[in-house]
Amino acid sequence: MNNYRRYMQGHLKEVAREEKELEQKAGLAREKAGEIARQLARRFGVTKVCLFGSLATDDFDQFSDIDLAVAGLPEREYLKAYGLAEEIARPFAVDLVLLENAVETLKERVQKEGIVLYDRQGEENSPLKTPDIGNK
């Protein structure tokens, strides 16, 4: 029984360590999402940036990426904006979705679960401030 108890204690410590690492990784991903939103607003004049997906719904895991929905980004600027987002997001992968071109089900998903990182209309999410997306 003693070996089992030691095994369980070690296992629980390992699980706690992994959870802490994952929380730190999610925090870094949120910081990067906020920086991407600020840079898209400054450089491309987007009107809105929303975080959605696992990072917005607290389902973040070791394979998660940063999912961002963007409004007001001209299509001709998409590749430049995506390149910038990709650069900032490293080591995370990033998905950048143009809301104007998104299918209705994706728009509904963003509306339902999304966290607004930047909204030209909203004072609290101005591009000069860090959006509060830490602990949703």
Can you annotate each of these PLM segments?
Residues T47-L55:
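Short gly/ser-rich loop at a beta-strand->alpha-helix junction or flexible surface loop bordering the NTP-binding
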Residues A69-A71:
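Short hydrophobic/aromatic beta-strand micro-patches
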Residues M1-G45, T57-Q62, L73-K136:
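Catalytic core of pol beta-like nucleotidyltransferases
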